[in-house]
Amino acid sequence: MAEPAARSCCLGWDFSTQQVKVVAVDAELNVFYEDSVHFDRDLLEFGTQGGVHVHENGLTVTSPVLMWVKALDIILEKMKTSGFDFSQVLALSGAGQQHGSVYWKTGASQVLTSLSPNLPLHEQLQACFSISDCPVWMDSSTTAQCRQLEAAVGGAQALSCLTGSRAYERFTGNQIAKIYQQNPEAYSHTERISLVSSFAASLFLGSYSPIDYSDGSGMNLLQIQGKVWSQACLGACAPHLEEKLGSPVPSCSVVGAVSSYYVQRYGFPPGCKVVAFTGDNPASLAGMRLEEGDIAVSLGTSDTLFLWLQEPTPALEGHIFCNPVDTQHYMALLCFKNGSLMREKIRDESASRSWSEFSKALQSTEMGNGGNLGFYFDVMEITPEIVGRHRFSAENREVSAFPWDVEIRALIEGQFMAKRIHAEGLGYRVMPKTKILATGGASHNRDILQVLADVFGAPVYVIDTANSACVGSAYRAFHGLAAETDVPFSEVVKLAPNPRLAATPTPGASQLGAPS
């Protein structure tokens, strides 16, 4: 029998909080290989829980940088052992957990450019980092630095207009400021600061990869309109910061070819391109194939909204990032803490712990709930900062309780109305071609999705997003190969599996979520 034809492909990587994952996607956009290395399970010597170390103060949260390097060694060796044909890889790209930062020690670039193919990366890069434990997105120890940054630029709203977000503890600029203030010696011995995404890209390049616009938008340092570092923000954080960061680049940039290390050790082709790595949320937007006017709603423990925006209006809530697949446009992220746990609580209290009873309540109550409205925040909400359960009757009077079925509809309509109101606050508008892509646990409940369609007045589709950051990275690698010819991302991914239609708005629904 003839050998199966070799499959040209792109690789998509995801350096996330708990694991490193890879997928291989062929020219027809089929995923035909995937693998992962789990930090807690496969790298016990680093002693992480959930991929991180939570320090004694409960606020500082870090990950060992060499753990990430060793994870890449392990996964590449696993691929080699499985017989994966690296010679067919046209390009690769990847995603990193957002906001985390890596500090390369003076002299590290020479080591990167002269790697020996006979040794794993982690053995050669041991002395290359001025900070061995990298701050990650779960860290909330930089409140003082956040206040300093906002004061330096004229307040929280001014910072948001400039960089897309007010100052957040996890954002990289504030983390860099803390390191400069508390460990000035380590800072002075740092020649380059990478995000987790550009750090991972640097490992493949054998030289420092630039930060891309989209992940760079999560630092409180990048001017999202001009796509350059804000001098005021850099100056407020630390000296000589611009030279340590390098210049940012468009997210679809080809930043180089893989280092000869990968050619000699694993058999990558010398021409294999590295497309700029980005953050995990922007990569997920690519994996879900959002287009202009679309929204993705992830209905999980917390609910997250991804929006495609043309003209953003940055606010004190939510985040605006440069769009990873269209340099002219933007994306927004809104996070809501009271997600599935709140839905489960009301299900337990009002529907005898049964999702089918919960669905019956949504089916038997009318759209708009007879004017009854509720907002349910059992834990302190992020968007907006508010706590408690708030119920309003049709006469707009606060009431202490609703009938069980009204309670259930009030919860779901209220959750989705809040999402629409906050999305519109960031400049989002529902368009005739708008699609809503629903993912996460609650996306399996068609009655919940019907309410979502009615509140936004747009059709809801469901999509499998098990590996959306990884698959999105492979799609972006294909786009990087084509982007030099100005081919739009939507054209590159048109062969990918289509999402499934789950709900269309009920006639008259446009009145429900429309701003009053």
Regions from the PLM with identified roles:
Residues 69, 73, 128-134, 143, ...:
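Generic internal hydrophobic packing segments that stabilize the cores of diverse globular domains
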Residues 36, 133-135, 248, 274, ...:
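Conserved beta-strand scaffold positions in the cores of enzyme catalytic domains, especially
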Residues 1-123, 263-273, 453-460, 487-490:
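N-terminal glycine/serine-rich phosphate-binding loop of ATP-dependent small-molecule kinases
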Residues 238-250:
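A conserved helix-loop-beta module that forms one wall/lid of the active-site cleft
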Residues 32-34, 129-133, 300, 318:
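Short edge beta-strand segments in beta-sheet-rich domains
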Residues 37-39, 137, 320:
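A generic structural motif
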Residues 2-5, 11-12, 21-27, 86, ...:
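Active-site core segments that coordinate phosphate-bearing ligands/cofactors
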Residues 59, 81-135, 163-170, 201-223, ...:
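Short beta-strand-loop/turn "lid" adjacent to the catalytic site in phosphate-handling enzymes
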